[in-house]
Amino acid sequence: MSSVKKLSIAFCYHMHQPVYQLNYDSDYLMPWVRLHTAKHYLPLILEAEKFPNLKQNFNIVPTLTDSIIDFSGNALDIHSALTIKDVKDMTPDDKEFILNNFFDAEYTSMIEPYERFKELFNKRFSENCGIDDFSLQDYADLTALFNLVWIDDSLYKRFPEVLKLLEKGRDYTLKERKRIIDIYRKIAKLFVPACKKFLRDRKAELMISPFYHPILPIMTNIKEAQENLDTVDSTLSDLDMSDDARLQIEAAIKRSEKVFGRKFQGSWMPEMGVSENVLKLLSDFNIKWTIADEGTLSAAMNYNFIRDFDGNLEDPYHLMKPYVSKTTGVNIIFRDSMLSSLINNEYPNYSPEDAARDLYEKIKVIQSKLTTSPDDKHLLTIALDGENCWNNYSYNGREFLDKIYELIENDYSLETVLISEYLEEEKHKKEIDAIKSSSWANRNFQLWIGEPVKNLAWTYLKNVKKDMDNILLSNKKGMNVELARKELFLCEGSDWFWWYGEPNDSGQDHIFDYLFREHLKSIYKYLGEDYPRYLDLPLISTIQPTESSVDFPITPAMTGEFEDTEWESANCVSVPDGPILQGQKLFDKICYCADYDKFYLRLYLSDCIEEDSVNPVLQQMYIYMKNPDRIQTQSPVRLINKTENVSPVMKEKFHNELRVSMTEKKLYPIRFTKAIQDGLWAIQNSERIEIIYKDVIDIAIPFEDLDVRRGDTLEFFFANTNFGIKDAFSPQDIMLSIKRPQ
């Protein structure tokens, strides 16, 4: 039997946040840099203190580094500014913001364990709750607790005051709240020195990224980047930002060398976006290596990696070797996407011990299949985000990481490595002919371009860059070219295009849209020109009702069965897959129409309602409706946003609410309510509402019950819920509309 060959493991963590400022000296509109530094970034880097042989690889995007440095000084975000504000001076808007945003934490691990936080949560999400239902001390305690629970417990030894304040539990003073924010500054101050220490000790390696996290394959060759997309926008065919791609890499190298005191040898391209053009750029800047997804290798080799029922590779050899590009000489290592996905998505559902043991066993399976390899050295790359998954673990994943690192450290046949050191010693790299333009997501860029709203954002960016280039040709005096170019680079970042359109939903899309357009406007300001007025128009449909394309009367048969030709003439809206890591959509398609007397709906159920008949799961959907053509008593949506910022549609008020509840095989009685004074709802007689459930759900509601007269417009939207907890909108963040025929 062949002896086991040593397997090297490269743990790689990507740390990135977009710029949350309107300009370079303003407060941050979102707190995520500050919070993730205390909860994830610094604790992850400090893991190396616990294990003498542990080596980790980190990609810290330059914009994140600068933001962390900013927070180590006097920078504030809206959350921290409100935390250190005297509650006696808080305005109604301040209080509304706190109630809508200071519960943005994972409920099970960050809210429920703390009695006072849980008490405030339950109070906030009780029916008919408003800002005046909370005392000044409630606001003081809520702001304090929100910030305290975002500090990882691994930092308590360095900051014992955090634990004391958590144990106090309530009645926080202004002095204590200011102290909490001061602790955040001290945490931020530790970040860069910790990185430098582990760099010196050869326990960490840092990788470069273009400064503002742009997707370089799109910027350098739009035609290649649009391959394998569902739709291609021909108006973007002339998009070319190759010059900016080069400048963003150059700026990142200069800044990173200044902050960390050394030149980086490796890179993590944003969204693992690589192409031949990108490799050429890296070669030009003497970047020795980059990371890509296993799907990119599969496409380049025209080779499918086959996995067994447990997800283990049948033949891991090709994925466990570093490659060198024949055309550029740049080394490429490819991550095992299955293992990275398990850490991101599956292992949070395990106990830390079981998760670590499962990962260890999968690593050992890979190792066992390499005994017949012709080579002695092999590299397993596990690469993932440094923040997104850890809140779903107990103790922010620290127990899991401690255990897997311990198992590896105690196994003489395994080792963790710094990538540059490994590549320097590896003499048997495989050659690769050409890399196809691809990302970590399905080998294409569908999540950032191709969807109509995303394409519109790219069009805005393309047009503004063209304007800027033309303005610069004038060489007029008074232009601040440096700041204008920074604003342009910032708008080239991938995050804008990730959140625009389908399928992703931040819960704060309206803020991202506002920031994107404001930064584009600032380019013209720094160049001394007026900005084009189209930049005042939101790219996203926030609360603007859609136009009904069918305005003639249709009376469909109420059968609940697919075969019904009348519905073929109705308005239909396809519901895309829901936001990543959120609940599944309840419906694939929604059709609607009207005749002179009734409003009709047909709901096509998605696969998520299929279930084990022994344990049926109750699904709920709310329909909110109003008539914008006349004055009506209206009440707010009474659904809970458990962890998200409030979306614009949730701030609207409506005249009627219909709740539909079902399992796979059973329809429960509907609840029909009408808005009454003081923002309340009263149950109405629903006998005249028809509802049939077989293959689909058919609903017919008399217009009279909705206070919609002939010629009036009915606006409506749907919300999937889990017992009153808002799961997703259908469609996302827009309202549909239809006119009652005259």
Regions found by a protein language model. Give the residues of each.
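Active-site and substrate-binding clefts of carbohydrate-active enzymes
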Residues: V4-L165, I306-F552
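Short, solvent-exposed turn/loop segments enriched in Gly/Ser/Thr/Pro and often Arg
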Residues: N59-L64, P210-H213, G266-V274, G295, ...
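Structured, charged N-terminal subsegments at the starts of enzyme catalytic cores
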Residues: K178, D182-H213, I222-K223
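CE4/NodB-like, metal-dependent polysaccharide N-deacetylase domain
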Residues: D230, S234-M269, K364-A383
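Catalytic domains of cell-wall/extracellular-matrix polysaccharide-remodeling enzymes
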Residues: D243-D308, N388-I408
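Acidic/polar low-complexity flexible segments
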Residues: V550-D551, Y622-K651, K694, E704-Q742
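Extracellular/luminal beta-rich ligand-recognition
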Residues: F562, E610-V696
